[in-house]
Amino acid sequence: MRKTTLPAFISTLVVCYIFWLLITGQIPAVFTGGAAPQILIAGVLVSVLAAAFTARFFIHSKAFHLFNPVRLFTLLFYCIFIFMKELIKANVDVAKRALSPKLPVNPGIVKVPTELKSDYGLSMLSNSITLTPGTITMDVADEDDGTNLYIHWIDVGSEDPKEAGDQIKGTMENWIRRIFE
C-alpha cells in the first residue's frame, strides 16, 4: 500500500475544502467577509479527515510533474483547442446522423492500440474519447501486443486497429503524451 506524502495530503485537503465551500455555498461569503465561522471550521475538520483517509488513493506522487509550466500550458492548449475541435467535429457528425436517416450507422466495438504508458495519460485519452459523441471507451487492457482500448463506435469506419485508432484518436494521443510522459 502506498504511503501518503505531504504534497498529496495538502493537495487533497485543498480540493476537499474548495468542494466543501462550493456545496455549502460559502464561496461568495468568503470574499465578502460574511462567511459563517462554524461552517468554515467544520469544512476544515471534514477536509482534514477526508484527506487523511483518501490522499494516498486520489493523488499519486507522479501527478506532481504536471506543475511544470510547459506541461500546464500544453494541458491548457489541449483542453481549449485540440479537444474542443474533436468535440465539435464529433457533435456535428452525430447530429447529422440523428437528423438524416440516410446516413449510415454501423455500430461496433473496435480494438485500438495506444502507446501511452502512464495511468494518467491512459485515463485522459479514454475520457477524451468517451466525452466525444459517438464513441465510448469500454475497456483499457494490457495485452501481449501492448495496451489496447476497446471502443464502441457509432460508425465503424475500419476494422483495422491502427486505421480505426487514427480515425478515433486523431491527434489527441500525441498531445496527451506531451502532457503526461
Language model features: what each stretch is:
Residues 105-181:
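Terminal membrane-proximal soluble interaction domains of membrane-associated proteins
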Residues 1-91:
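Membrane-targeting alpha-helical segments
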Residues 3, 61-64, 68, 79, ...:
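Generic preference for well-ordered secondary structure
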Residues 96-99, 112-114:
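Membrane-proximal, non-transmembrane interface segments of integral membrane proteins
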Residues 91, 95, 102-107:
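Short, structured loop/turn "capping" segments at alpha-beta junctions
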